[in-house]
UniProtKB/Swiss-Prot annotation:
GO terms for cellular component: cytoplasm. Homohexamer. One of its GO terms (biological process) is coenzyme A biosynthetic process. Signal peptide: none annotated. SUPFAM superfamilies: Nucleotidylyl transferase. ATP binds at S9, F10, H17, G88, V89, R90, E98, W123, E124, F125, T126, S127, S128, S129. This is Phosphopantetheine adenylyltransferase. HAMAP family: PPAT_bact (MF_00151). Pathway: Cofactor biosynthesis; coenzyme A biosynthesis; CoA from (R)-pantothenate: step 4/5. The record marks H17 as: Transition state stabilizer. GO terms for molecular function: ATP binding; pantetheine-phosphate adenylyltransferase activity. Keywords: ATP-binding, Coenzyme A biosynthesis, Cytoplasm, Magnesium, Nucleotide-binding, Nucleotidyltransferase, Transferase. Gene3D superfamilies: HUPs.
């Protein structure tokens, strides 16, 4: 059995993230979505809130689980007995950054193998940060995030 980890801040989960989750769940026997604490970002939702949202929107995917962690992804990889790390990439800028991250993860833990899944063109422009900004400015995010996330975002940011 092949176990994959999909690590991110997911603050909040978007339909782009969800698309990567669904596609990775078809490729790997087990997929654990890992909510990580990104010290470079100011989070709107607590790690537990993000886990709850992800669990709710992936409940129909039998081979998907979700948890939050602190610490390095390379350490989580070993703790979870993972075989591969999944990363979604929207564009060349993402890929350049993700290649650096993959290199560092492999430096820290030679067992870490990273697989890049290109974003569906439908989601190339979406990011959690951009979606939060649109909500703050009163714009519509309909269709960019799951409905439960949209409702929670609007109540949190207005």
């Amino acid at each position: 059995m092949t176990k994959a980890l999909y690590v991110g801040s997911f603050d909040p989960i978007t339909n782009g993230h969800l698309d990567i989750i669904k596609r990775a769940a078809k490729i790997f026997d087990e997929l654990t979505v890992v909510v990580a604490i990104n010290t470079n970002k100011s989070a709107l939702f607590t790690p537990q809130e993000r886990v709850n949202l992800i669990t709710q929107v992936t409940r129909d995917l039998e081979n998907v689980a979700c948890k939050s962690v602190t610490g390095l992804t390379a350490e989580t990889f070993t703790q979870e007995k993972a075989d591969v790390l999944v990363r979604g990439v929207r564009n060349g800028e993402d890929l350049n950054f993700e290649i650096q991250v993959a290199g560092m993860n492999q430096y820290l833990n030679q067992e870490v193998e990273t697989v890049f899944i290109p974003a569906n063109s439908k989601w190339e422009f979406t990011s959690s940060s951009l979606i939060k900004e649109v909500v703050k400015m009163g714009g519509s995010i309909k269709g960019l995030v799951p409905e439960t996330v949209e409702v929670l975002l609007k109540s949190r940011l207005k």
